[in-house]
Amino acid sequence: MDKRHDPSRRIIAPTGTELSCKSWLTEAPLRMLMNNLHPDVAERPEDLVVYGGIGRAARDWECYDKIVEVLQRLEEDETLLVQSGKPVGVFKTHNNAPRVIIANSNLVPHWANWEHFNELDKKGLAMYGQMTAGSWIYIGSQGIVQGTYETFVAMAKQHFNGSSAGKWILTGGLGGMGGAQPLAGTMAGYSVLTCEVDETRIDFRLRTKYVDKKATTLDEALAMIDEANKSGKPVSVGLLANAADVFAELVERGITPDVVTDQTSAHDPLNGYLPQGWTLEQAIEMRKTDEAAVVKAAKQSMAVQVKAMLALQAAGAATTDYGNNIRQMAFEEGVENAFDFPGFVPAYVRPLFCEGIGPFRWVALSGDPEDIYKTDAKVKELIPDNPHLHNWLDMARERIAFQGLPSRICWVGLKDRARLALAFNEMVKNGELSAPVVIGRDHLDSGSVASPNRETESMLDGSDAVSDWPLMNALLNTASGATWVSLHHGGGVGMGFSQHSGVVIVADGTDDAAARLGRVLWNDPATGVMRHADAGYDIAKNCAKEQGLDLPMLEKATTEGK
């Protein structure tokens, strides 16, 4: 019997103000754990899989049930420890300590590879937490929409004189992360052709309005893109096809998109990427009987796709790796120049990270969309001079369907996170919001990740692989009073290639919450500014000085420079 598979389970988070736990500080992680497994949120909720190949919310259903049970009895001065999706201990702490501390899929570096992890996984000794799956703050594809949108806008500025009109994007993958691309692309003014091998994923994205149209042949998809470009009305098309096949065929035909990227689950060659010529059913069976053959075939197909991406780049396409480690997989398969196209962070996002700007998000525990709309208005009120941000909030309200509990993603930085959170807390206190909100972020943030093929690629000082930073981030957030803190390995790019930390905090309208919010949501983005200032980025150094950060070695460097 598979302890992870139970098709009878249908998990829906409670809403409203009635508590099933002893306080909002334990009710919040309970609801967010459940929300991660909502049928409109998770990719395979019956298997506890939230997104990203096998990114899970709990190790198995027995562990899930026990986590729920413990959260419902947890006292306000106790902390639950969750080890790779398994609740392993409850300890007396204090009321400003985290209620939950999570560690997922962390391995001693010598053994930090998929082969060793998969052995542990099969024995029921580990769980892949991805980033926000195992840390209980996934909000569906909206969680990556704005970051993807910001990247595509930056690409238009850098490559197309600021205009995406008549331009189109070629990409792959419509899973939990990749599913954001078509909507983000059309919001940024491009048409988007996304290849996906699983028709149910295309249909899901159609239903949730992340994709406009479905095509079953490349000719049909290209005709849709061509018509959209001629009419000036961007369209997103989900093409039922293998990305490696399509990318290579476009090279053969001499058709060059304006932008090329990919967000298949290439980080996990066993569970996340379908080899060319294989059916989904064939892959599922082969994973049970010959893992090595699946991995080899998947990497060979990735090599084909990356070679095509390089050829399209040479033909003039703006080409970028969108953080799934496909370049590394192709490199291991003999594509020596796989890294000739850049990752999206060093190419387009790092200046934002230097100011602590990243994917700030919040969720209405009430379940009432009006609570999110009221917070949208509060963000506009408190940040009145940012038309780009206002435009994002307007588009998000108009075009993004909530998945599970209503939520919002909003890229803001050190200057704004704490004051927004304190304003939300005041709105809970005075009754403007009908229930508390939880505030968190992706692990993809400025100070919370070490990932040499993604967030920390090509750091100015060569410190790409130094992972002290996310460890310090997690420890500082714990000391600052976050509601739950997580420390993961392998998210985004796979085993052996990243370490990263997450933080979530509850705004319940109390004075104690205000004190915690002020500490956590200042310190958390400040570690990102610190990390980039330490690496030598002038934007970060200037931000640190402007915001009065106490960075002893930066102060020394400034003094020496006088």
Curated annotation (Swiss-Prot):
Its cofactor is NAD(+). It comes from the Bacteria. The keyword Lyase applies. GO terms for cellular component: cytoplasm. SUPFAM superfamilies: Urocanase. Its main location: cytoplasm. The keyword Lyase applies. Binds 1 NAD(+) per subunit. One of its GO terms (biological process) is L-histidine catabolic process to glutamate and formamide. Its EC number is 4.2.1.49. Pathway: Amino-acid degradation; L-histidine degradation into L-glutamate; N-formimidoyl-L-glutamate from L-histidine: step 2/3. Pfam families: Urocanase, Urocanase_C, Urocanase_N. NAD(+) binds at residues 52-53, 130, 176-178, 196, 201, 242-243, 263-267, 273-274, 322, 492. It is found in: Cytoplasm. Catalyzes the conversion of urocanate to 4-imidazolone-5-propionate. Belongs to the urocanase family. This is Urocanate hydratase. It comes from Shewanella pealeana (strain ATCC 700345 / ANG-SQ1). The lineage of its organism: Bacteria, Pseudomonadati, Pseudomonadota, Gammaproteobacteria, Alteromonadales. The gene is hutU.
